Structures are given as C-alpha cells and as structure tokens.
Amino acid sequence: MLPAAARPLWGPCLGLRAAAFRLARRQVPCVCAVRHMRSSGHQRCEALAGAPLDNAPKEYPPKIQQLVQDIASLTLLEISDLNELLKKTLKIQDVGLVPMGGVMSGAVPAAAAQEAVEEDIPIAKERTHFTVRLTEAKPVDKVKLIKEIKNYIQGINLVQAKKLVESLPQEIKANVAKAEAEKIKAALEAVGGTVVLE
C-alpha cells in the first residue's frame, strides 16, 4: 500500500489501474493474436493440431479443389482459350517449349532425329569482313607495289610504304567488306604482290 501522503499524487494512476483490471475481467474480444492464443487453451490445441506435418498429405482448400475439378472437365479448345486468357490477364510472355530428354523419348522420334542431325552439321556462315594481308612481293615490281600500298593505307608516306613492303608479311587493311577486300587484292596482285584474305 502507498503511504497516505503519496495517495493524492498517485490517485489518478490507481484509478486507471483499477479500470484496467475491471476491463480485463470482462470478456472483451482480444485484439492481440498472442494474448488470444494464451487465453484460449482449446483454440490453441486446435491451431497446433491443424499445422501440416512434413509427411502428411497436404489438404487443399475447397475453392482450389473446385477449380481443379472445373479445369479437368474442360475440353482441349477450352483449355487453350483459358491459357490464352490467363496469359493476357497476368501479362505473361509466350515462351517456346524446351523439350526435355524424358518427355521427348517417345513423343516425336523423327523430328528429334532431324534436330540431332542438324545440330551435328555446322552451318558455314559466309564471312562478310576480311583482313587483307600482303605476303610476298616480286623484286622487279617493288616500286609499283609501294605506290599502290600508299593508296590503300591512309597517312602513310613513301618511306613507310617501302619499309612495309620490305618486311613482309604485313597487314594492309583489317575488317574490310568482302567487295572492298577483293578490290584491294586484285589491285595489289596486278602490280606484283601476293595477297591473302583472312
């Protein structure tokens, strides 16, 4: 008990405390889930009994079971329409099917064999860009070759072109379109050079 001198100061607090006890004694619906679980022993046992175990079969809500039954009764055309509508509604992009080994084992053997043959044969792509490389030069035609090289390499003078021809093989131009590479090759071979397109 509080001393008599302190009672006037604590009076309002004691009144609140008494009101709280009175409120707690009444059966007021619980707001807090933890207090609700603590206060109702029977409901707590039901909640624990309803928790799924790892090895127990999962029980699905009746709404889900009804959906499965409804979908199972649809025809293939109706399933296709349902699939299309779900993709539009849920904004799912259409992704092609990726065949798996187990699924494809007996499904379409001829198509699978055709795909296997196509995968084994490498497709030769036609190259579109080449590197023009000068490999040899005839000593008689060096002067003509130096002048022609000066036409195809920008910013090179005669001395640099002469050094380039004397230290073969050399790259003349890289990453050139096929038509231009053949044009350069024809021009350099016309003045006595041996050119390789790589």
UniProtKB/Swiss-Prot annotation:
Pfam families the record matches: Ribosomal_L12, Ribosomal_L12_N
UniProt KW keywords: Acetylation, Disease variant, Isopeptide bond, Mitochondrion, Primary mitochondrial disease, Ribonucleoprotein, Ribosomal protein, Transit peptide, Ubl conjugation
Assembly description: Component of the mitochondrial large ribosomal subunit (mt-LSU). Mature mammalian 55S mitochondrial ribosomes consist of a small (28S) and a large (39S) subunit. The 28S small subunit contains a 12S ribosomal RNA (12S mt-rRNA) and 30 different proteins. The 39S large subunit contains a 16S rRNA (16S mt-rRNA), a copy of mitochondrial valine transfer RNA (mt-tRNA(Val)), which plays an integral structural role, and 52 different proteins. bL12m interacts with NOA1.
Location(s) in or outside the cell: Mitochondrion matrix
Organism whose genome encodes this protein: Homo sapiens
Protein known as: Large ribosomal subunit protein bL12m
GO molecular function, one term: structural constituent of ribosome
Consequence of substituting K163 to Q/R: No effect on promoter binding activity of POLRMT
Name of the gene this protein is made from: MRPL12
Entry annotated with the keyword Metal-binding: no
